[in-house]
Amino acid sequence: MVVFEITILGANGGPTEYGTQCFILKPARTEDPELIAVDGGAGMYQLREMLVQGRNENEGDDELVPSFYEHDREPIEFFIDSKLNIQKGLSKSLLQSLKRQGEHFESANTMKKTYEVFQGITDYYITHPHLDHISGLVVNSPSIYEQENSKKKTIWGLPHTIDVLQKHVFNDLIWPDLTAERSRKLKLKCLNPKEVQKCTIFPWDVIPFKVHHGIGVKTGAPVYSTFYIFRDRKSKDCIIVCGDVEQDRRESEESLLEEFWSYVAENIPLVHLKGILVECSCPLSSKPEQLYGHLSPIYLINELSNLNTLYNSSKGLSGLNVIVTHVKSTPAKRDPRLTILEELRFLAEERNLGDLRISIALEGHTLFL
């Protein structure tokens, strides 16, 4: 049974600025147009493009996705597991819910429709405050005041995220401090690590975990990111949506990933784990010192192997969808996403992880898990 709809607004790991990480989430088949987002590296531009794609969905290139390497476009099946339930554009249930809100949506122009969809995003869960995870949200934020009836937005995050957003982004220097505006349409709120938070609009639990994401260039101080568990309270099904991450550092006293996987294995039966959206930024050829707080296939497979060991299932992680995000667009001959996907599948088979379903997160598509 499909429980979660996940629309990929952006999954690019840089250095190109287009479509950096942002996912919008909703329960499957609901009639409510409200949405939540994980990260805000993309936004209204990508929503507008998806609405245009939906209007032109019969123009014949639905099964090709942008690549810009060996070919400018490649068949979608090169990037995804054959069993992945995926659709180009916004989900039909979301579009239908918007139409039911009023006849004006059907007759509205594309820009007005874009505003309608964006206004439905009431909550952002930010993994960390790097620009590629917040730029769309920040630039889009004044649109909250474009319409009198626009909904308020709350930006959630662990303290390492919210403190930086308040001090260094919404500070009237880098960007207007819209959190101080009288109507309070934009709020920043802190979450506590490992503490269950009830989602404000869906019958979901949200559980954030702090993870490592490298060290500062100048200070050498640890940089942190966040993994979010979203749990549907009715079905008990869960998805994990990850920010940037590296393996636990040997010199650190914090075994954050080890603690996270232990929590997952102890609290989420494998049958209820619908999918993991997780970064794998660089191919195997990358040296450890070139990862800069990210994962390559060997390190991601190591983490999945640790999870497999904790579950101790005779079938491995069979049936689990792993959606790979944040691949860097490096100047290679072959699309790095295809290289990384091939390497991950080979290593997963070598480690006997079972029928692990590994796919690449594709911008402009919706997943049904």
Swiss-Prot record:
SUPFAM superfamilies associated with the record: Metallo-hydrolase/oxidoreductase
GO molecular function: 3',5'-cyclic-AMP phosphodiesterase activity; 3',5'-cyclic-GMP phosphodiesterase activity
Lineage top rank: taxon: Eukaryota
Keyword Hydrolase: yes
Keyword Hydrolase carried by entry: yes
EC class name: hydrolase
Signal peptide: none
A Pfam family reported for this protein in Swiss-Prot or TrEMBL: PDEase_II
Swiss-Prot/TrEMBL keywords: cAMP, Hydrolase
EC number: 3.1.4.17
Catalytic activity entry: a nucleoside 3',5'-cyclic phosphate + H2O = a nucleoside 5'-phosphate + H(+)
Annotated GO biological process: adenylate cyclase-activating G protein-coupled receptor signaling pathway; cAMP catabolic process; negative regulation of glucose mediated signaling pathway
Record's function text: Controls the level of cAMP in yeast cells, together with the high-affinity cAMP phosphodiesterase (PDE2).
Family: Belongs to the cyclic nucleotide phosphodiesterase class-II family.
PANTHER family membership: 3',5'-CYCLIC-NUCLEOTIDE PHOSPHODIESTERASE 1
Further comment: Present with 1400 molecules/cell in log phase SD medium.
Protein name (database record): 3',5'-cyclic-nucleotide phosphodiesterase 1
Provenance organism: Saccharomyces cerevisiae (strain ATCC 204508 / S288c) (Baker's yeast)
